[in-house]
Amino acid sequence: MCWPLLYPLMLGFSISPAECQTPSIYDDVESTREGQEASLRPTVELNESKSPDKPNPRGFPGKPCANNSDTLELPASSEALLLGWVPTRLVPAIYGLVVVVGLPANGLALWVLATRVPRLPSTILLMNLAVADLLLALVLPPRLVYHLRGQRWPFGEAACRVATAALYGHMYGSVLLLAAVSLDRYLALVHSLRARALRGQRLTTILCLVAWLSAATLVLPLTFHRQTFLLAGSDRMLCHDALPLAEQTSHWRPAFICLAVLGCFVPLLAMVLCYGATLRALAANGQRYSHAVRLTALVLFSAVAAFTPSNVLLVLHYSNPSPEAWGNLYGAYVPSLALSTLNSCVDPFIYYYVSHEFREKVRAMLCRQLKASSSSQASREAGSRGTAICSSTLL
């Protein structure tokens, strides 16, 4: 993995002073006239026609105000994209849907998997996937509030770093867990004889630990640098959407490209290979497994459709496009990132509720809960009537 080599860059240390050193506010004073003129010229400038051979910033490129480093100035075009109806209406609507649907769906699925289903290797993987989707629904409300309030973050710097890392951590953790599920199903269906020796709780536990630790390692750099800045000329405290140009150009470009490649493209490639071999094995049996073929194709399509667009836009954002495309690419990336979270609502229905046995267990469990609550309510009503009779007798 290339992340250990990138940590010095992400912490702000430079490997090549000529390329990565963060410029000071003013150049050193030289003895020549050119040096004297250069010493009075700020090196941190906001120029929409910036040379395309320089790395692009993460998010919208912001220019720190001369008298306040906590405030960023944005070009008018970037500010219009940042405050438009897509990030302030569409994105919070998507996040709200994820919370409303994903929280009960994944919570119920996790409950059934943990209490009513035999602890098989596939069950452990699906439980971890349900936990990841459930955690997303729990950490999304702050970002929902942020977008609904017109890009105003009220929870402080630490909460912004945690919320940003959690959002990206869910994305890449989910992709890694989905890749582990595809490997498990490949072993079970294509190598069914060997699977008895390979598929065990030990291998499953290792796969889950690798997925969680890899996701945490990939998003850890997001907690190293400041993420909240005040938008110049307004009361909007931005969270991760606009960052200083000079502080981001040296390390965020390799960091986020590595994040997209290792956290998304490589696991998705593994899923395509595993599910491709699984589909061939199922299709060889004709109509006998037609339902399994359709379901496997749906699982693969949903994962690719959910995670590919946002990560492709992320890579394009760092591939030195024309200066006019910087804001447009990030403006498209924000809703595509929100759309990727919809996968947490889809997972329960294509992995759990599609199974007739699973639905029966859910139905039986809900019926027992309803009967228990009805009997408890009836006993309380009977007790209250008895208390009323005793009270009237005493009177």
From Swiss-Prot:
Disulphide-bonded residues: C160-C239
Gene3D superfamilies the record matches: Rhodopsin 7-helix transmembrane proteins (1.20.1070.10)
GO MF annotations, alphabetized: G protein-coupled receptor activity; protease binding; thrombin-activated receptor activity
GO CC annotation, single: plasma membrane
A Pfam family assignment: 7tm_1
Transmembrane regions: 94-114, 120-140, 162-182, 204-224, 255-275, 296-316, 331-354
Residue ranges listed under propeptide: 17-58
Biased composition (Basic and acidic residues): 47-56
Signal sequence residues: 1-16
Region feature Disordered, mapped onto this chain: 46-66
Entry keyword annotation includes Signal: yes
Post-translation changes: A proteolytic cleavage generates a new N-terminus that functions as a tethered ligand.
Keywords assigned: Blood coagulation, Cell membrane, Disulfide bond, G-protein coupled receptor, Glycoprotein, Hemostasis, Membrane, Receptor, Signal, Transducer, Transmembrane, Transmembrane helix
Glycosylation sites: N67
Extracellular side stretches: 59-93, 141-161, 225-254, 317-330
InterPro entries, per database record: GPCR_Rhodpsn, GPCR_Rhodpsn_7TM, Prot_act_rcpt_4, Protea_act_rcpt
Recorded topology in the membrane: Multi-pass membrane protein
Keyword Zinc-finger: no
Any single GO BP term: platelet activation
Site description Cleavage, residues in chain: R58, G59
Protein role: Receptor for activated thrombin or trypsin coupled to G proteins that stimulate phosphoinositide hydrolysis. May play a role in platelets activation.
Family recorded in the similarity comment: Belongs to the G-protein coupled receptor 1 family.
Protein name: Proteinase-activated receptor 4
Organism: Rattus norvegicus
Gene responsible for this protein: F2rl3
